[in-house]
Amino acid sequence: MKDWDKAYQEGETPWDKGYASPAIAEWLQKNSLEGGVLVPGCGLGHDVRLLASHNNQVTGIDISQTAISKAKAIEVVNNESYRVADFFNLAEDYSQSFDWVVEHTFFCAIAPDLRQSYVENLVNMLRPKGYYLAVFFLKDPSQIDSEGPPYKICREAVEKYFWKNFNLLDSFIPTSHYECRPKGSEYVCWMQLK
């Protein structure tokens, strides 16, 4: 398992581009969200601040103490909070606590053998009929490898893990993306708990 705190301590964080996910920002241009929001694997909180700027109560969690300390040191936008926490050990603390879970490639940062557990925890944290907005790294099924993180995923795997518990409301390949990522490498899904 990757030592996420060490990566933040040593500044070895190529995934941190210094600003919020362009794909999430693109989604927010056409949609709104209301209620409590959880951002797992929030890192330095760029997505947390973007979501909080839309007048939401947003909680960012990360397993890295260093990442959370740095996130807290950045000026507060509005209604955001941060907590050092392991997404896989939040069940009792956050059971049915959120209207939304919004994440940018967090699912792709965890080892594939943890994916089913991720979905179970996600379902437990959402209120009835809660929403899940996710940005996934895409790869053709024939190109999926075990090297990671990130562990890229194909659309068929998204269906396998999520469609049992969620209805798909919308999905798209974002036109906005980090410059270093090729167009078509991200897949945005907006889902609602059944």
What kind of region is each of these model predictions?
Residues 102:
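A conserved beta-strand element that flanks and buttresses the S-adenosyl-L-methionine
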